[in-house]
Design a protein with these regions (language model features):
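Predominantly flavin-linked oxidoreductase catalytic cores and closely associated redox partners
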Residues: 1-132
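Short alpha-helix boundary/capping motifs
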Residues: 12-13, 66-67, 116, 146, ...
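Tryptophan-centered motif/residue detector
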Residues: 27, 57, 85-87, 147, ...
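Short secondary-structure transition/capping segments
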Residues: 38-46, 98-108, 174-179, 238-257
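Short flexible/disordered coil segments
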Residues: 59, 63-68, 134-136, 144, ...
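FAD-dependent flavoprotein oxygenase/oxidase catalytic domain
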Residues: 102-104, 128-130, 136-137, 221, ...
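FAD/FMN-dependent oxidoreductases across multiple families
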Residues: 106-190, 196, 202-206
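C-terminal helical "tail/cap" subdomain of flavin- and related membrane-associated enzymes
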Residues: 189-281
Length: 281
């Protein structure tokens, strides 16, 4: 709940036994993931209309991993016509997360059951079929849709958003966990500093959000390029090998420094050329 000045004062909790409890505090951190409880209550969530994607995923045992030191690597595999893509994420105890991602309309509209849809997409991804040839599915299928969003406000007096409650871009580069940890770290620093200064205002608790948004925007741009089918990262890197280090930085989340977006000085025109909107020189 909030007081008359819109400052956070307390939360109403329900225990495992079903009992209701009122807990007061000075700062509320919304780390509720894509449930985004506070962001949804305050109507701060803004879905990205350009990334209306959906995913179907599950878990397998005994999937074929790459040998040696690459056995734990996350792998992205396209279907035949690049209408969708699969993730392959090795986890502990021989469990592998496997999911398919594509446009919401393509994946979930006018199709059969999610089991049949997943099987149909798998049937047009021979590389993933090979990895799952000896695997056993150990969980039911899960569905997520329209998961790309931002928030119009990330902090207020006595509250702050972090992780997926703050926003989510796309699963393609597996950046969500890193951004969740980074935003949590930055929010914690701002809270500690706020207590020391006696300032728990929205501007203090969210003082880091501007720089954070500037960095994550480079990943958002990279995702947009990935979903431009006419554009090829491979061809781009052959033409502009000087950006290899910059691209690597983006892919590993090293985005909070001056020059992190330099690659787009050449990539933006290359995409325009690929789309036929710009003449070749």
């Amino acid at each position: 709940s909030f007081d008359d000045n819109d400052r956070f004062t307390s939360v109403q909790l329900q225990t495992a036994a079903g009992e209701s409890q009122q807990v007061s505090g000075q700062v509320l951190v919304d780390a509720t993931g894509q449930q985004a409880l506070l962001a949804n209550r305050l109507k701060l969530r803004n879905d990205n209309p350009l990334l209306r994607k959906a995913a179907i995923w599950t878990y397998f045992n005994n999937a074929r991993r790459d040998p040696g030191k690459h056995g734990g690597a996350t792998i992205i595999l396209h279907t035949e016509k690049k209408e969708s893509w699969f993730w392959f994420i090795p986890l502990a105890n021989d469990v592998t997360s496997v999911g398919v991602v594509t446009d919401h309309e393509y994946l979930l509209k006018g199709r059969n059951s999610i089991e049949e849809t997943f099987a149909e997409e798998l049937a047009i991804c021979s590389a993933m079929q090979e990895k799952l040839a000896d695997a056993t599915q150990v969980d039911s299928l899960h569905v997520a849709k329209e998961f790309s969003y931002t928030t119009t406000q990330q902090s207020g007096d006595g509250w702050v958003l972090t992780g997926d409650a703050y926003g989510f871009i796309d699963p393609i580069y597996s950046s969500g966990v890193y951004f969740a940890m980074k935003s949590g770290e930055l929010a914690a620093d701002a809270i500690v500093e706020g207590f020391a200064k006696g300032d728990l205002s929205g501007s203090q608790l969210g003082k880091w959000s501007g720089d954070f948004d500037a960095g994550t925007n480079w990943i958002r741009k990279l995702v947009d390029k990935y979903y431009t089918n006419e554009f090829s990262f491979g061809r781009f890197m052959k033409e502009f090998p000087q950006h290899q280090g910059n691209l690597t930085d983006l892919l590993i989340g090293r985005i909070f420094y001056d020059g992190a977006g330099n690659i787009f000085q050449d990539m933006d025109p290359a995409v325009e050329q690929a789309l036929g909107k710009m003449p070749l020189e």
